[in-house]
Amino acid sequence: MTNRWFNVGKIVNTHGIKGEVRVISKTDFAEERYKPGNTLYLFAEGAAEPIKVTVSAHRLHKQFHLLQFKEMPSLNEVEHLRNMVIKVPEEDLGELEEDEFYFHEIIGCEVVSEDGELIGTVKEILTPGANDVWVVARKGKKDALIPYIASVVKDININEKKIKIHVMEGLIDE
């Protein structure tokens, strides 16, 4: 089994009597990830092995995703799943378009200016709205907030874990 797992949601409660669970999604690809027939893995805190489940139904309800699993068709069978984290193995992530990246590929990358000056390392990605914002940790200075927009991010090399940016005036506090 895989060594790398990626969080795609968390079961926060049950819903109704038909074995549905309420999920807070942690993926940008919920429709794809929770599609009936897909395999997901449920991780309980402290458990040695995940529980492998197959999605049998998926629907939206308010701000939650409601999932049913083929292996657990009743409320009694899903009650113990509360607070479990839903993950997928790395090989199930799927391919992205040419200029799209998974967060785990960006986090940890070095950020340099167009002049080659080291700015810092991406430590977190925020998703406030129109575009993502990368939080860049800098040695001995405040974190820099870098918008993921074409006028700022000039090159991303995932293999070298290096990102080149155009430092606009006022973008980075000294």
Swiss-Prot record:
A Pfam family reported for this protein in Swiss-Prot or TrEMBL: RimM
Cell location: Cytoplasm
Domain PRC barrel: 98-171
Annotated GO biological process: ribosomal small subunit biogenesis; rRNA processing
TM region positions: none
Molecular-function GO terms, alphabetical: ribosome binding
UniProt keyword annotation of rRNA processing present: yes
Cellular component terms per the entry's GO annotation: cytoplasm; ribosome
KW Chaperone (keyword) present: yes
Entry keywords, A to Z: Chaperone, Cytoplasm, Ribosome biogenesis, rRNA processing
Quaternary state and interactors: Binds ribosomal protein uS19.
Family named by the database record: Belongs to the RimM family.
Entry text on domains: The PRC barrel domain binds ribosomal protein uS19.
Primary role: An accessory protein needed during the final step in the assembly of 30S ribosomal subunit, possibly for assembly of the head region. Essential for efficient processing of 16S rRNA. May be needed both before and after RbfA during the maturation of 16S rRNA. It has affinity for free ribosomal 30S subunits but not for 70S ribosomes.
Protein name in UniProt: Ribosome maturation factor RimM
Species assigned in the record: Bacillus velezensis (strain DSM 23117 / BGSC 10A6 / LMG 26770 / FZB42)
